[in-house]
């Protein structure tokens, strides 16, 4: 390294001493939303574990008769999350329809309600093939006994 190269770590505080500054107060886990930018809503869905929520976003698209919302991630497949989705759709989207669902990956908190949301609101799902088929495979029961190829794998 050259003698005059800047020390990129000089301004980084020691671990455990830094504090995070958020530009917005988080939404309550009660179907409240925070508009983080025009047409971008942030909401939280509850999770019954130490990490007690998942962040979910709604993206407004289009104008006039084509306007609607895309969901990014779903929350858990629980009755509480389903009830919150019903309330969000009924009260927080300016009367506009859902247009689609994007699941970022297959984890149960990000895609747990994919089937329910797509069926309930007749919207398409966008997800990579790899994530979709991994999610499907994890949800399937293996035949008894397991096929030889799986045993050898």
PLM region descriptions:
Residues 1-32, 139-148:
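Accessory terminal helices/loops
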Residues 20, 44, 77, 102-103:
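A generic structural signal for short
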Residues 1, 40, 51, 65, ...:
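Generic low-polarity alpha-helical segments
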Residues 30-96:
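Conserved beta-strand hairpin/beta-sheet module of binuclear metal-dependent hydrolase folds
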